[in-house]
């Protein structure tokens, strides 16, 4: 492992594999920007072999928000560098760099004018910068190098595959558990509860390469169909035999023990049974309990009384014990009876229900993953995790080296941000691209901080980071904290800088960092505040409600002082008053957030929970809105009364009673809801809800309440969602039914609750969400909460150092390793929490720490409490804090008896700025648009319409699609059944073309006649079962028709990895589409007598979708399927007829456009691509004419190099 050295951004080598460890607040983003500038300019020492442009520098991070932020920061650095270099070029005075040490050092060996030119180009092209999320990068590579990845161009990215998982979890439950006998089904229902419960247990680890650690490997290897009868059924059978044996033997057992209890022993002999435990009266109760258990088919657990008192080993343990009084007596002779030995043998032969339940869960997991995999093999939906898996697999297969080389060629340099959040699959991808085949002209930098690896629950793997760290050629670290005031930095150094592994693992080191000396300080009522303030409760227990109250009152005092201009941040040059938005309260989850928010609300302090993941459908407003919609849909007494009884209308019981009693009042309400119904029907639901909002004064009413902003935000959000959903539902009733299902949680769409306000509010945020952020003042009210016992988890997963694998410890044999992982992450979470503040942190702690392990307790004791969940004794909190205070001198305040008292409710005034809409003064070009071949061809025909003779009118508006006109005469199914052999008489029209295209898209070409898929095709064509054989024969003929005598290949010969189906494209028109130049080019170089195109000049893009692109013998071919009906005989599909149809429908224009699009695509992804050498040609397959004979129904052309080259200039 390379030694870690301080980073110098000027000298860091850029042509190797390096790792940068960036502790919290040490300027990681600034460092990335500095290295980016060096790469753009080929500047500094140990620089890259050539200057790179923004498209060649790959920067990968893990969230969309981080990606946008990083792009913004890099753009700002480039702009700043342009301004400073420009100023320096004019003055040659280094003061132009304004104390920018990096640029000052960088300019020493820089051609300033060339550098400014390159930076301006980079600034202009930042929208093209290769700054992506990990999933965005994977998707781009899969699509761009589709022939190497085998990915379908029409893949549908699904952010949330919950609906699929629910579907497959239910399927598995039905398929395997419904047929079980009563006892086995009872076991499943009790242990696994429901498919939803199983998903909640498995979801976090689905898709991981998870090995199971268990002694009985066979229980894992058998399929579920064998596991259930052999193991679950076998358990129930053996258990029933045990119960039956007990019932048969109960009287005998009772007699044996009774005889022993009344047996006389010599006075100098200890008894074989302890008669204080075993008594005749107790014996009867014990046996009755076990009898009841034996007669209860629902109870599958081993009875504890049976285990404790009637097994041979437990009886031997329960002999009379030697004491001081009877120490002279002879030892007891162990009591033995074959019946107890037999009972023990039977019990020990049983697998524990806990293990059996986990094994069943393992098989459920395997079945669920297989269902998901099978589904995705046959469908285009792909999740984010699938993108990673597919790229990783593509890089490992036979063409993986070539794919890695192409990616390396495209991105010779890569930086991976937040690398501590990586996993083994992500590292395998970048390892394959950059580490396995290092080249002189490539560089790879991993940037992260193992101390901030807190996303294990999302699949992040700290051990992958540590492995990558060991494999890096060089390791660097950032050594100065720019975020926090000096004394806060000193405090973190004091807490974590101790020898006993502050982060549990030896290879996660803590290095004390330096800090700035020019930071502001926090002053309260004229006095400088300590960096750390601890409030100790009088209770020894963690009382979260009390701690939340202390936190809220402390914040109230801060804000009161701020209102009096007595809470300020200042130094000699700068002064600013504390605002509510400067304060953050860090919590672990929404429950803690609710406690704090509630206490703040009591004191009149508005706050916002920034980590709210709840659905808006779970809000009270959603339920009340459902009542309102019911009344609008059904204008009747009961629905209207239910609606106006909601909080939205603000009526009380007396008001509603008055409405019921007063006919005029009631009629007004009935008329209102009738009007709302009409608005819904005529203008839509959004218009209706806005009408209700205005007429009923709902906004004013809600905003007058404490939770008003939250409720109004939810109302408006739901109105938007309902408006969007209305487009998908045919009636108001259907929309209301959908809305009620969303509230109930059925197949719920993603609708995360929105922030209620962006005003100056106290922020409440989870520690996980706060990572990477900073706040002026930070409150940590719940850090003393004891750690949860990791062994209590149902699924225990840990990393095995010996096996270098993630293991499911199904038998709980390695709880020490599990505890280490859990505690290590708790410490990393603590580190993140303690490094968010800029000026002060405040804590609420109990008088004593609990006897359970706690991360803050661990660092305050400098690791002395060890790594066991249960501690020997509790520790006095004040004593621990005093040790910390001694190191920090005057920068720690310990309040042992918080004398905070709540003040009167605050009224915080916020300035409301007046806003005015800007006036648009620009000019929008109206001729930019996205068109298609179909639009171009139809426009051409419309132009010709006015010059053609009336006798040709019937053909003017032919759609020129891949199928016959919608107006073509349909052949009935009845006629088809009379003449099944003539496939040429298939129905005509759009439906047929669409169905055939879908069939070709979904099937392997070697399996076009697959019975299951043929049935789907037949049904979509509305043909009965008698047509199945004809369809199969026809599709067999299509797949085996040689496309060309020259290349000698049929569709059936194509490997799936050499095909891209339904390849969409956007062909950019570089300037304007020059119609005259297009016609001139065709006349000069096109061998078909194509007519002149009549079309307007436009700019923009031409879009389309190529049915098939395939690769054969190193050449690329374009294929289009046509289901056009040309006649009832095969002679109607000969080469002359096909050529005539190609010209009549202008398909030659289509394939020239498609060829140009494919040509440009291949230029961008195939190294050293050459059209003359690499492009094979175009096949148009007229499916009705393909009968297995060479080139039957197949039109082929290969546009000349000159034609495509000139067309490339036309578009």
From Swiss-Prot:
Function: A helicase/nuclease that prepares dsDNA breaks (DSB) for recombinational DNA repair. Binds to DSBs and unwinds DNA via a highly rapid and processive ATP-dependent bidirectional helicase activity. Unwinds dsDNA until it encounters a Chi (crossover hotspot instigator) sequence from the 3' direction. Cuts ssDNA a few nucleotides 3' to the Chi site. The properties and activities of the enzyme are changed at Chi. The Chi-altered holoenzyme produces a long 3'-ssDNA overhang and facilitates RecA-binding to the ssDNA for homologous DNA recombination and repair.
Gene3D superfamilies: 3.90.320.10, P-loop containing nucleotide triphosphate hydrolases, PCRA, domain 4, Recbcd, chain B, domain 2
Active site: 1120 (for nuclease activity)
Cofactor(s) annotated in UniProt: Mg(2+)
Assembly description: Heterotrimer of RecB, RecC and RecD. All subunits contribute to DNA-binding. Interacts with RecA.
Domain UvrD-like helicase ATP-binding residue range list: 1-485
Comment field on protein domains: The N-terminal DNA-binding domain is a ssDNA-dependent ATPase and has ATP-dependent 3'-5' helicase function. This domain interacts with RecC. The C-terminal domain has nuclease activity and interacts with RecD. It interacts with RecA, facilitating its loading onto ssDNA.
E.C. numbers: 3.1.11.5, 5.6.2.4
Note: In the RecBCD complex, RecB has a slow 3'-5' helicase, an exonuclease activity and loads RecA onto ssDNA, RecD has a fast 5'-3' helicase activity, while RecC stimulates the ATPase and processivity of the RecB helicase and contributes to recognition of the Chi site.
UniProt cofactor note: Binds 1 Mg(2+) ion per subunit.
Family label: Belongs to the helicase family. UvrD subfamily.
Record-listed ATP binding positions: 22-29
Record keyword Zinc present: no
UniProt region (DNA-binding and helicase activity, interacts with RecC), positions on chain: 1-877
Annotated spans, Nuclease activity, interacts with RecD and RecA: 927-1211
Residue span(s) of domain UvrD-like helicase C-terminal: 500-772
Name under which the protein is recorded: RecBCD enzyme subunit RecB
Binding residue positions for Mg(2+): 997, 1107, 1120
Any GO molecular function: DNA binding
Gene behind the chain: recB
Residue stretches in coiled coil: none
Reaction catalysed by this enzyme: Exonucleolytic cleavage (in the presence of ATP) in either 5'- to 3'- or 3'- to 5'-direction to yield 5'-phosphooligonucleotides; Couples ATP hydrolysis with the unwinding of duplex DNA by translocating in the 3'-5' direction; ATP + H2O = ADP + phosphate + H(+)
Cleaved signal peptide residues: none
Source organism superkingdom: Bacteria
A GO-annotated cellular component: exodeoxyribonuclease V complex
GO BP, sorted A to Z: double-strand break repair via homologous recombination; recombinational repair
